[in-house]
């Protein structure tokens, strides 16, 4: 008789079959439950404290899952779904994670009835395909032919308002209106129209800076770029018109040699000669920049005090230690070429701007570059009373920018407030009857999961969720396809379009895709093998993501 077979290293744990699947489902559902209360315009905020003690207060799904240090591999799949949603459309992250959790919760009910995971996956995929078809039928095309027209701007404002209603920490109408106006103006400038009537919206041309002080209403849109730096020398001009700008990633200083070297000096004359040579070298670099016509120098690296003196004598405005990301944006905006070798610089390397000026913003000085060669480069300067308000305003701004980009890339909208989910649930139940076999059960569970979205919206708005769901079902059965939860006023509206609660089709479709992909990925797993943790000399555990995982049992998200 053969002895026991040792397949894994000592300490390795394994769970398989339904145990592994239930463990994974529980982890994912636990994460989704945490995010449920943050969904919608009345969603609550989460306070996240990282290992350094830094505090983040937000209800933005992408930020929440990024800040939480989640360990369980199944829950990490939902985090990846949120990241995919954020990368693709920049909005709907909370919805994607919550819906994935709901789909898995419903799948577990089917597993209890001995429905095989493969059948559930096939049913969910069929439901997704049908749901995307229905969304296209429910969608309304909007006219974005002329973005400067009042009609188009009014439509865009409605879309941004829906996105902002659930995001903005300050919550004041004036602040929200200010941000909405900034977003629409910025998008209108950078958008490029395609032959088919849609737009390419390069968001990398929109730079966002934050400066503490004042209020959100003091935020401004700059037609150019803003550098959070000040002019390096008191003798330099503070304002340069018709600026010819040299963008450097080379240092304007004498760099130390990479080899180890010592200089032996035996007399004061040698010291003077040494310093004179350094000054001559720096003067040559400044003279070279002046000779190609530069009257503004923006440098990624340092500028020596002696070089600053020579630049000031030439009347050149200079800024140093500018971030690499800003240098790259300047290259695009100014039509410049980044200069790596000053001695090889030519006039063709220079960028152009109508005005470069140092201004005081709050307690700090900033350099404004306006009238750039590329007129589509813009900078939004956010103001706010504290860092947390500024951070949340920036997240709100990014979501709003992505929301507008989505609708310009695909100018189709649907009703918000859970109206689409309610109508999808109704039609998917009808569709399920036409599908044979146990897949019908999975499609019905998909419909149930979708219906929980308006229930969550109702609950966060302080409404009775079950009563709200019953009312919604009745209205949709009567043909009110746009009926949904008016969370702001705490009631059910017959037409969410009329009260300007609308969402881009691109976001809504991607939410469904991301949620189904994450849920099906978890349902496919039937074996969980966790390697034993490595131990240090002191007996502390070490290892990768799977180190120290405990299975089976209740999952830990920490």
Swiss-Prot record:
The keyword Cytoplasm does not apply. GO terms for molecular function: ATP binding; ATP hydrolysis activity; ATP-dependent protein folding chaperone; unfolded protein binding. It comes from the Archaea. Residues 548-558 have a biased composition (Low complexity). Keywords: ATP-binding, Chaperone, Nucleotide-binding. Residues 536-558 are annotated as: Disordered. The keyword Nucleotide-binding applies. InterPro entries: Chaperone_TCP-1 (IPR017998), Chaperonin_TCP-1_CS (IPR002194), Cpn60/GroEL/TCP-1 (IPR002423), GroEL-like_apical_dom_sf (IPR027409), GROEL-like_equatorial_sf (IPR027413), TCP-1-like_intermed_sf (IPR027410), TCP-1_chaperonin (IPR053374), thermosome_alpha (IPR054827). Belongs to the TCP-1 chaperonin family. Forms a Heterooligomeric complex of two stacked eight-membered rings. PANTHER family: CHAPERONIN. Molecular chaperone; binds unfolded polypeptides in vitro, and has a weak ATPase activity. This is Thermosome subunit alpha. It comes from Sulfolobus acidocaldarius (strain ATCC 33909 / DSM 639 / JCM 8929 / NBRC 15157 / NCIMB 11770). The gene is thsA.
């Amino acid at each position: 008789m053969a002895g026991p077979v040792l397949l894994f290293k000592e300490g390795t744990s394994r769970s398989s079959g339904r145990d592994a699947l239930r463990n994974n489902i529980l982890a994912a559902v636990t994460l989704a439950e945490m995010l449920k209360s943050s969904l919608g315009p009345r969603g609550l905020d989460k306070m996240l404290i990282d290992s350094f003690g830094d505090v983040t207060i937000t209800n933005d799904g992408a930020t929440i899952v990024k800040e939480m240090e989640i360990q369980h591999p199944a829950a990490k799949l939902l985090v990846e779904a949120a990241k995919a949603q954020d990368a693709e459309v920049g909005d709907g992250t909370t919805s994607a994670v919550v819906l994935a959790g709901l789909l898995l919760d419903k799948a577990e009910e089917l597993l209890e009835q001995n429905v095989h995971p493969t059948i559930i996956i096939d049913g969910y995929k069929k439901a997704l395909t049908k749901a995307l078809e229905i969304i296209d039928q429910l969608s309304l095309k909007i006219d974005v032919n002329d973005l400067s027209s009042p009609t188009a701007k009014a439509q865009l404002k409605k879309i941004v308002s829906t996105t902002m209603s659930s995001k903005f920490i300050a919550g004041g109408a004036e602040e929200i209106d200010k941000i909405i106006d900034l977003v629409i103006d910025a998008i209108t400038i950078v958008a490029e129209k395609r032959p088919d009537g849609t737009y390419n919206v390069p968001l990398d041309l929109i730079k966002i800076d934050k400066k503490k002080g004042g209020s959100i209403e003091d935020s401004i849109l700059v037609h150019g770029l803003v550098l959070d730096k000040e002019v390096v020398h008191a003798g330099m001009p503070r304002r340069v018109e018709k600026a010819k700008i040299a963008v450097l990633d080379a240092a304007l200083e004498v760099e130390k040699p990479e080899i180890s070297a010592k200089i032996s000096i035996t007399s004061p004359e040698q010291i003077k000669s040494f310093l004179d040579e350094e000054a001559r070298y720096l003067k040559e670099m400044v003279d070279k920049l002046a000779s190609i016509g530069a009257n503004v120098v923006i440098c990624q690296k340092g500028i020596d005090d002696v070089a600053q003196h020579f630049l000031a004598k030439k009347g050149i405005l200079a800024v140093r230690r500018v971030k690499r990301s800003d240098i790259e944006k300047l290259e695009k905006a100014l039509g410049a070429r980044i200069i790596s070798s000053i001695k090889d610089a030519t006039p063709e390397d220079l960028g152009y701007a109508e005005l470069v000026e140092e201004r005081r913003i709050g307690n700090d000085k900033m350099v404004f570059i306006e009238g750039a060669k590329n007129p589509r480069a813009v900078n939004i300067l956010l103001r706010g009373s504290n860092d947390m308000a500024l951070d949340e305003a920036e997240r709100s701004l990014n979501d709003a920018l992505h929301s507008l980009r989505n609708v310009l890339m695909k100018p189709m909208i649907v009703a918000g407030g859970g109206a689409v989910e309610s109508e999808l649930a109704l039609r998917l139940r009808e569709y399920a009857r036409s599908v044979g076999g146990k897949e019908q059960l999975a499609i019905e569970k998909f419909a149930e999961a979708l219906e929980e979205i308006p229930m969550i919206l109702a609950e966060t708005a302080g409404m009775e969720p079950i009563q709200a769901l019953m009312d919604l079902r009745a209205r949709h059965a009567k043909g009110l396809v746009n009926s949904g939860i008016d969370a702001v006023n705490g009631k059910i509206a017959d037409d969410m379009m009329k009260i300007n609660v609308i969402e881009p089709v691109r976001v809504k479709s991607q939410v469904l895709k991301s949620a189904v992909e994450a849920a099906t990925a978890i349902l496919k797993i039937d074996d969980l093998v966790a390697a034993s943790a490595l131990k240090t000399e002191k007996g502390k555990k070490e290892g990768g993501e799977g180190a120290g995982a405990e299975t089976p049992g209740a999952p830990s998200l920490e």
